[in-house]
């Protein structure tokens, strides 16, 4: 599996929409996201078309329009989004669950390479299917607060100090139980 630029930008856009939603900005314009992510707006709009067709985002036209999340963040799994944008997670097609193609190996059942790649595919799928957009937004918000950084698309009129503390208070632990890769057992990472 290799994450394409299209897949990377789709995930980053969803994270931005999730952060904006948590911070009280339910709609973001494509131009704001394109500026933040430094990519052509037409490319981002193509990505949003795919995400919208699958129900991950919704849009509203007009001066105050833009894009927002189409589902609750805890229902958006990273594995599903990557499969939508980039296709199967499998490193070789003979281990794919979405696009299986028999390989050239004469004995597929006993092929060592296939067994290894099946383990790789399963590990990737398990990890990506475990994380939801809510998980990543929560981790990101905690890091932003810790580092006192304002998301670029919120700098237009919102200050970090007034917005992030109430959000983190709703999270319950003030950001202490998450490290850079996910939940910890109450220990802080050094």
Protein language model features and the residues they cover:
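Alpha-helical residues within the helix-turn-helix
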Residues: 35, 52-53
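Short, hydrophobic-biased segments on the C-terminal half of alpha helices
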Residues: 48-49
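A short alpha-helical element within helix-turn-helix/winged-helix DNA-binding domains
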Residues: 27-38
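Short amphipathic alpha-helical interface segments
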Residues: 10-24
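Non-DNA-binding regulatory cores of transcription-related proteins
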Residues: 72-172, 177-182, 189-190
């Amino acid at each position: 599996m290799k994450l394409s630029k299209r897949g990377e930008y789709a995930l980053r856009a969803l994270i931005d929409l999730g952060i904006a939603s948590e911070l009280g900005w339910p709609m973001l314009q494509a131009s704001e996201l394109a500026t933040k992510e430094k990519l052509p707006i037409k490319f981002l709009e193509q990505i949003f078309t795919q995400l919208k067709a699958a129900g991950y985002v919704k849009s509203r036209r007009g001066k105050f329009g833009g894009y927002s999340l189409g589902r609750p963040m805890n229902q958006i799994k990273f594995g599903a989004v990557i499969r939508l944008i980039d296709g199967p997670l499998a490193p070789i097609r003979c281990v794919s669950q979405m696009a299986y193609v028999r390989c050239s190996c004469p004995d597929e059942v006993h092929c060592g390479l296939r067994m290894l790649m099946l383990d790789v595919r399963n590990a990737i799928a398990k990890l990506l299917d475990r994380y939801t957009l809510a998980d990543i937004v929560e981790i990101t918000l905690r890091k932003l607060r810790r580092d006192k950084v304002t998301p670029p698309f919120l700098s237009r009129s919102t200050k970090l100090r007034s917005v992030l503390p109430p959000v983190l208070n709703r999270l319950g632990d003030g950001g202490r139980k998450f490290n850079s890769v996910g939940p910890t057992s109450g220990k802080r990472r050094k």
